[in-house]
């Protein structure tokens, strides 16, 4: 979608800010996935912001990322990047306290909540992928 009205303004980085800038509701906003080109569903628009992702701008067009492509990106990172297990003790020794860390989910790449980080610490369930520490969020822990 062309966002010509935003040429003179700073480009929004979240779906919410884009809706506010264009004075559109979330339901009326049409947003394509940068990777597959499909339109992102309304639920995926909400999850995009919850995950802490930022809109990608190309030639005055805003793009997001659908859930399927976020998961594929995570799998590709795990397959082609270095990947190792890390205990919570090692993590805190190497970095700061758990609460100060900004961690993403190993499955969907969303930012982990404090509860998710605590569960990962209890289970000693952290991974390092391409130099970045990851754990599983509560949604990715659900059985298929």
Swiss-Prot record:
One of its GO terms (biological process) is symbiont-mediated perturbation of host apoptosis. Keywords: Activator, DNA-binding, Early protein, Host cytoplasm, Host nucleus, Host-virus interaction, Inhibition of host innate immune response by virus, Metal-binding, Modulation of host cell apoptosis by virus, Transcription, Transcription regulation, Viral immunoevasion, Zinc, Zinc-finger. Gene3D superfamilies: E6 early regulatory protein. The keyword Zinc-finger applies. Disulfide bonds: none annotated. InterPro entries: E6 (IPR001334), E6_sf (IPR038575). It is found in: Host cytoplasm; Host nucleus. A zinc finger (unnamed) spans 33-69, 105-140. Forms homodimers. Interacts with ubiquitin-protein ligase UBE3A/E6-AP; this interaction stimulates UBE3A ubiquitin activity. Interacts with host BAK1. Belongs to the papillomaviridae E6 protein family. This is Protein E6. The gene is E6.
